[in-house]
């Protein structure tokens, strides 16, 4: 396919970042400018020669700007096939438009405002913009469509290399971006309006109707491929990593990789688990994860202390694990890790220059800097099933001291309460059935993923015993209620002093009585944290 010279461009943008400089570059290269409304006014204010679309078409903007570019002289100039439609274009006075520069009304920003009304949303549905974008993308053989201001400099550079022309490869790539842009835009609109109707399949359920505003009738998702991978969870599976560009919260998706090999599928999944867990803590914390489960979590006076205590829980499982911190990774901690263990990934809000130098001794270790976080943003979680998608709120629920209900005769001490809340936060990130033993803000044993809650407790005890850690005097957290007293009896045998769990079983009183028989503290949270 041939290069196409850019002689005339139509510019109509809502986000005007960089548009003046780009227009100046086009004019410098001999390109004639057409424009509309606010964009035309801005270009004229910067002494750029610009023709208003209404002057070109002979038809004024009308209906408060709702109709500006919906005209045959505009779309004929964009859609006209060079070499095929030249005669009809000349007959009707239609000039070829070789480049269209458009970004759309800020619908997402508008509906995100707390005071946004339906009328506000409707007025921010762009009509002319997407129409021009689709027209130009369809005719990419002859026309360049630009929807992202990050492409401005590269386009001008290519024009310089190709006598003010753009290659077919570039035009095709720009067309793909354009279709992605309009697809995402329409998806946002569909999702917004879909939240305003009652779900037609479950109209008889009043409670579901009350909550329907959270989940649109049709769910449209837009993710951008960030990374192609050698393979997926297993070597026979192909894989790629897609990200939501609207998410700004510190995460594995937004993190900056400072060194190391490319992240694998499992690296990303495990790093996400580690980072989301360490975000739960305010004091200096370290979380070590293996196969998406915490194998060691601790708080400390600093992150070196926290790391040493987290590692102590299960050094065997920590080998080849993922380490997450909620403070800057410093030189001392980096050196301790390098000297002590093999690690796949380290992630922290920030990494000091000295720590980076230390980590260069292990150049294959993936070192990530994710930035600071101040709060957890509300979001949806997804689980794919064959033929469907389960959607729910992300589990951001946590409890504080004031939310706890002490149901045992013995009351917890201040330190026991701290340990119970620490233990509860960890249990939230352990696969169900989850049992966590902890003491002095350090995990002592973790039992994960067992079909029987009692066996998860046994595994937690075995883990502690294998590492020479004392279970006696520990607190225990369970992600869900105890259906029978056997779990409490087993905990008492190994010296557990306090138990925290949601409660809600038909046999709660039987379980509470068991705690009292063993002079244990029992605290209910009223909140379950299943994790499958």
UniProtKB/Swiss-Prot annotation:
Catalytic activity: (6R)-10-formyltetrahydrofolate + 5-amino-1-(5-phospho-beta-D-ribosyl)imidazole-4-carboxamide = 5-formamido-1-(5-phospho-D-ribosyl)imidazole-4-carboxamide + (6S)-5,6,7,8-tetrahydrofolate; IMP + H2O = 5-formamido-1-(5-phospho-D-ribosyl)imidazole-4-carboxamide
Record keyword Hydrolase present: yes
Cellular component terms per the entry's GO annotation: cytosol
A molecular function (GO) term: IMP cyclohydrolase activity
Pathway entry: Purine metabolism; IMP biosynthesis via de novo pathway; 5-formamido-1-(5-phospho-D-ribosyl)imidazole-4-carboxamide from 5-amino-1-(5-phospho-D-ribosyl)imidazole-4-carboxamide (10-formyl THF route): step 1/1; Purine metabolism; IMP biosynthesis via de novo pathway; IMP from 5-formamido-1-(5-phospho-D-ribosyl)imidazole-4-carboxamide: step 1/1
Record domain MGS-like: where: 1-147
Alphabetized Gene3D superfamilies for the sequence: 3.40.140.20, Methylglyoxal synthase-like domain (3.40.50.1380)
This enzyme's EC code(s): 2.1.2.3, 3.5.4.10
Keyword entries, A-Z: Hydrolase, Multifunctional enzyme, Purine biosynthesis, Transferase
Pfam families: AICARFT_IMPCHas, MGS
Superkingdom, natural source: Bacteria
Example of a GO biological process term: 'de novo' IMP biosynthetic process
Family from the record: Belongs to the PurH family.
Record PANTHER family: BIFUNCTIONAL PURINE BIOSYNTHESIS PROTEIN ATIC, BIFUNCTIONAL PURINE BIOSYNTHESIS PROTEIN PURH
Domain-level remarks: The IMP cyclohydrolase activity resides in the N-terminal region.
Protein name in UniProt: Bifunctional purine biosynthesis protein PurH
Organism from which the protein derives: Haemophilus influenzae (strain ATCC 51907 / DSM 11121 / KW20 / Rd)
């Amino acid at each position: 396919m041939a290069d196409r010279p850019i002689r005339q461009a139509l510019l109509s943008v809502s986000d005007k970042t960089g548009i003046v400089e780009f227009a100046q570059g086009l004019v410098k290269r001999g390109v004639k400018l057409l424009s509309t409304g606010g964009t035309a006014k801005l270009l004229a204010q910067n002494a750029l020669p610009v023709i208003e679309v209404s002057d070109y078409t002979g038809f004024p903007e009308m209906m408060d700007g709702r109709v500006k570019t919906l005209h045959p002289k505009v779309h004929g100039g964009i859609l006209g096939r060079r070499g095929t439609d030249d005669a009809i274009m000349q007959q009707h006075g239609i000039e070829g438009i070789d480049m269209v520069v458009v970004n759309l009304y800020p619908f997402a920003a508008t509906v995100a405002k707390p005071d946004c009304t339906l009328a506000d949303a409707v007025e921010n549905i762009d009509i002319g913009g997407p129409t021009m974008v689709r027209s130009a993308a369809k005719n990419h053989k002859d026309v360049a469509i630009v929807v992202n201001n990050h492409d401005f400099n590269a386009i001008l550079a290519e024009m310089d290399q190709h006598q003010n022309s753009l290659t077919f490869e570039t035009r095709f790539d720009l067309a793909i971006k354009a279709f992605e842009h309009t697809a995402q835009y329409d998806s946002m609109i569909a999702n917004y309006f879909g939240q305003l109707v009652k779900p037609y399949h479950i109209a008889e359920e009043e409670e579901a109707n009350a909550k329907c505003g959270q989940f649109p009738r049709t769910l449209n998702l837009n993710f951008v491929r960030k990374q192609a991978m050698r393979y997926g969870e297993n070597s026979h599976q192909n894989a790629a990593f897609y990200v939501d560009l609207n998410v700004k919260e510190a995460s594995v998706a937004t993190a900056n990789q400072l060194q190391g090999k490319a992240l694998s599928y499992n690296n990303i999944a495990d790093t996400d688990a580690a980072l989301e867990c360490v975000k739960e803590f305010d004091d200096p914390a370290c979380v070590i994860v293996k196969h998406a489960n915490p194998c060691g979590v601790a708080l400390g006076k600093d992150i070196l202390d926290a790391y040493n205590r987290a590692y102590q829980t299960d050094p065997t499982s920590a080998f080849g694990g993922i380490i997450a911190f909620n403070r800057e990774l410093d030189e001392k901690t980096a050196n301790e890790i390098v000297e002590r263990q093999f690690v796949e990934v380290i992630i922290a809000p920030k990494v000091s220059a000295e720590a980076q130098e230390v980590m260069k001794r292990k150049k294959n270790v993936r070192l990530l800097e994710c930035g600071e976080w101040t709060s957890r943003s509300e979001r949806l979680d997804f689980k794919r099933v064959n033929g469907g998608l389960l959607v729910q709120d992300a589990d951001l629920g946590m409890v504080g001291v004031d939310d706890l209900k002490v149901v045992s005769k013995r009351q917890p001490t201040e330190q026991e309460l701290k340990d119970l809340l620490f233990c509860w936060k960890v249990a939230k990130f352990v696969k169900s059935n989850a049992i966590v033993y902890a003491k002095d803000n350090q995990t002592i044993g973790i039992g994960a993923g067992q079909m029987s809650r009692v066996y998860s407790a046994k595994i937690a005890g075995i883990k502690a015993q294998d590492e020479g850690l004392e279970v006696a005097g520990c607190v225990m957290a369970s992600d869900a209620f105890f259906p029978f007293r056997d779990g409490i009896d087993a905990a008492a045998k190994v010296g557990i002093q306090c138990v925290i769990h949601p409660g809600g079983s038909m046999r709660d009183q039987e379980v509470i009585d068991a705690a009292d028989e063993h002079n244990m503290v029992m605290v209910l949270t009223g909140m379950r944290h299943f994790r499958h």
